[in-house]
Swiss-Prot record:
This is Probable cobyric acid synthase. Pfam families: CbiA, GATase_3. Residues 241-427 form the GATase cobBQ-type domain. One of its GO terms (molecular function) is ABC-type vitamin B12 transporter activity. Pathway: Cofactor biosynthesis; adenosylcobalamin biosynthesis. Belongs to the CobB/CobQ family. CobQ subfamily. The active site is at residues 319, 419. Coiled coil: none annotated. Catalyzes amidations at positions B, D, E, and G on adenosylcobyrinic A,C-diamide. NH(2) groups are provided by glutamine, and one molecule of ATP is hydrogenolyzed for each amidation. The gene is cobQ. Keywords: Cobalamin biosynthesis, Glutamine amidotransferase. PROSITE patterns: GATASE_COBBQ (PS51274).
Amino acid sequence: MKMIQVLGTSSDSGKSTLATAFCRILKDLGYRVSPFKAVNMSLNSIAIKDGSEIARAQWVQAMAAGAEPSAYMNPVLLKPEGHHKSQVIILGRSIGSMGINDYYNYINKNAKIIKESIDFLSNKYDVIISEGAGSPAEINLAGRDFANIYVSSLYNTPAILVADIDRGGVFASIYGTINLMQRSDLLKYYIINKMRGDQSLLYPGIERIEELTGKKCLGIVPYIDLKLPGEDSLDYNFSGSGSIGIVRYPYMENYSDFDPLIFNEKAFYIKNKEDLKRCDVIILPGSKDVFHDLEYINSNGIADSIKRCSGEKMIIGICGGYQMLGKRINDASGVESDGVSIPGLGLLDIETYYNKTKTTGSVKYRFAENQLKINGSGTGYEIHYGSIVKNNEMPLLITDHGPEGSVSSNGMVIGTNVHGILENNEFYRYITGEYLDYDNIIENSIETLAGIVKKSINIEGFLELLNDA
C-alpha cells in the first residue's frame, strides 16, 4: 500500500488545498488516487450518490483525483452543534449527537473503522493522499488524536508538514511542531505555503531548520487566489460588495452553497437589520440549530425586517432557512429542541415537522412550472431532519420523489431543501442576471492549483515518497 500523509502546523495552513493538488498531480501521472481524511470536523458536508454524508473537502479531492466519492474517504465526520456537542457521522451515517467525552470513548473502541477504511481504499487505488486535521503537535490530545499520527503510524506512512507563512512565525511553527509531535521520524519534508514576495528571504531559515531538525524543505508554494469550496467557516470570512445578502446566524452550515456567489463577489453577510438595506436578494442559509438561529434573528430585529421586505426583495431559504420561512416548525421528538413547536416567519404557507430519521442523498431535479418560469434540470443533495409536511405553495422543483420546495404566489419568496441549487446555471442566472459554469470554474481551479504546486515543489522528492510508503 502506498500512502502519503499531509500534516499541518495549524488549522487553515493549507493541508486540504495541497492534498487536492497532490491528488491531481498523481492522477495526471497515471496513478489511481484516493483522498482520505480519518476525522474531519466541518459543517461543510455533501451527500453523495449512495446517500452517505462526507466532508465537502474530500469530495473536492475526489474530483481532483478522478475518483468516485466514498464514505471510506472520510470515515468520521463531526458536525458541531453547539452546547459542547457534535453530530457524529460514521461511514456516512449519523449515529447521533455526542459530547467530547462520549465521542472519545466511542472512537477509542471503534478506531478500527479508520484502518478498515484505509484497507478498503488501498485495495482499490494505487495511492492514498491522507490529510491530517489541525496539527499533530496538540500535546493536550496525545493518545486521543486519531486524525494525524495515529494514521501515519498504522503503516509507517511518510508525511509532509504544511506551514502557513501568511500568518507569520513560520519557522517557529515548523520547529515547534517537529519537536512536539510524536513519530517525527515519519516526517520527511515540510512545505512553506502561501508565500508572498521574494522567496530568497527564506533561504537562511530553511538552512537553519535543516541543521536543527534534519528535515528538508520540499518547496515554497506561493499564495494562490483559488475558487474552490472551503473546508469550514474559517474559509468563509469574506466581506463582499454585491447586492445579495446572506443572513449570518451563529449555527449557519453548508457555507459552500454560496461559493458561486462568493467566487463572483455577488454576496455579503447580513449581520444586522441595517445590512438588509444594501441587498436586492436575501438568502437564509442552512442551520445546524434552526430553533436557536430563528430565535437569534427574531431577537435582533432581522426577522421583522425580512418580513417588511417581503414583496419588495427576493427572499430565498435553503434547508434550515427554508424551514424558517414557513408558518410553523414542530419538533415533538426533540431532535433539535426540547420538543417545542415554534412559529416561523410566515412568508411561505408550509409547516415543518422534525423526526429522528435523517434524510441524506443526492437529488436529480427539473424546475417545476411556476411563476419563475425557469427551465432546465440539475443535481443537488439533501441533508436534513426536518420534513415539509404541509405545503400549500407551488413547488420549485420536481424530483424523482415528487414535488420539492416552494414558490410564493408573487414569486418573491422561494424555498428548497436541495443544497447546491445555486450551482445550477439557470437558477444562478435567474437571481443574478449572469451566466455561471460552476463545474468548469472548479475544474480550472484544480488544474491551476496542481500546475503551480508541481512547479513549486521538488517533484522528484515527492514521488520518491511513494517508494517509502
